[in-house]
Amino acid sequence: MEHGGHELAVVVLVLLLLVSATSCTFLEEDVILGTVEEAKVARLGGGGGGGSKGANASTRRADNTCAGVGVGVGGGGGGGGGGGGGGRGRFYLGWKEEIAGMAGRPETAAWLRAVRRRIHERPELAYEEVETSRLVRDELDAMGVGFRHPVARTGVVANIGTGRPPVVALRADMDALPIQEAVEWEHKSKNPGKMHACGHDAHVAMLLGAAKILKAREHHLRGTVRLLFQPAEESGAGAKRMIEGGALEDVEAIFAVHVSHQHPTSVIGSRTGPLLAGCGFFKAVIHGGRRSGDAVLAAASTIISLQSIVSREADPLDSQVVSVAMVNGSDHPAATARAAAAEEEEEFVLGGTFRAFSNASFYQVRRRIEEVITAQARVHGCEAAVDFFENQSFYPPTVNDARMYAHVKAVAGELLGAGSYRDVPPMMGAEDFSFYSQVVPAGFYYIGVRNETLGSVHTGHSPYFMIDEDVLPTGAAFHAAIAERYLANHSPSSSSSSDSDDPDVELEAS
């Protein structure tokens, strides 16, 4: 080609680049605020570049980035002709990169660890979460987030966003367990006989992290995010009291996370429909003696007969549990014999738990437990009284709404990438998040903390329970993304708003 042709080609190429750089339009959420260095840590799960975990900003192409003007982020190379190092370039990064970048900053990760460790050192049982609640309020104050307290004694309810519908809620439980921690580390529980053995300290830290991200992105929220810091999940039905205190007023959907030792760190797991069982407890007192029946024999027959409820009556495709977990005939082995010899009334106590994945099955099992216990007592000439602890709310089954489940799965794929999500089987554990799921569409999901190198392999409620703290930034980012994307998809303006409602913000690199 002649020399003049080279000059003409260069001019045409420059014009094309200018047109490309100025003609791209972006949705209002496709904006990143911050520096180029901050953008480089927009990863929350394996890979090169910034080395943080998660979404890889360098892999985004024509969906939200104009080819030819992107610059490689996190060591992954650039998009189009602008890739690689050297020279100046412009970054058009979307909600994924901004949320991941904010959560992945070293100072954010350090703050999340510090918050979690402060809570872990001072565990508090149900409705005693005074210091934990104060920590939450102090952190929200520092962010400029308004809140309401007390709700359900020690609970905190905060709002971020427009203050108008739609309203989506995120929940974290705050209470610990009456367990003596056996893990020897710098931040071991300083409250004897109490331990965060179920990860609620991590739940609070992740929700506070989400609050910080959402507050920074408040101008992108097309509605309101409500944050529920709830007491008494382990016992006391704190969720029910939060609802009674107005925590779900105007809320149209709610989400919550629970750490899981069954999944690798930062992997999300959930399922549609029943996820966790409804849970109830029973206590039976069998009276015998005085020339009537033998309470011990009646109790033995009762325990055997209770096992037939599930094995002989339950639909094998509708999992149920009846378990006798406690028996007490006397304070001394000879007491029963003495009572029989003296023809005195004797007493035998037994108790346990029952579980099912639907309210119908739950109440059917409850009815049969009472029938079996009272009937077996009569067969042996005894009397029995059954207590189902009516003054304490049983935990209903936790059921994921199909749409909320789909939302969790979609956001996991978008934010964390392929392989970040797993469908999980239903479990016989129970959660008082179920009270929320009976009021509004709900999505409950797990986030993995399993790390065999660290020893994070023990189940919840174990004195050896621990977590991989690398999960904290991912959990905070995922919480924030769940809420922001829900509002983006469900706000009245979501289907009619312009792609350029907000001015674009560009990052420049030299």
Swiss-Prot record:
Supply the InterPro entries for this chain: Amidohydrolase, Bact_exopeptidase_dim_dom, ILR1-like_Hyd, Peptidase_M20
Where does the secretion signal sit in this chain?
1-24
**A Gene Ontology BP annotation from the UniProt entry:** auxin metabolic process
* GO molecular function per UniProt: hydrolase activity
Q: Does the keyword Heme apply?
A: no
Enzyme Commission number(s) of this protein: 3.5.1.-
So which domain of life are we looking at?
Answer: Eukaryota
Pfam families from the UniProt entry: Peptidase_M20
Question: Could you tell me where the Acidic residues compositional bias lies?
Answer: 499-510
What the record says about family reads: Belongs to the peptidase M20 family.
Protein name per the record: IAA-amino acid hydrolase ILR1-like 6
Q: Which organism is it from?
A: Oryza sativa subsp. japonica
Q: Taxonomically, what lineage is the organism?
A: Eukaryota, Viridiplantae, Streptophyta, Embryophyta, Tracheophyta
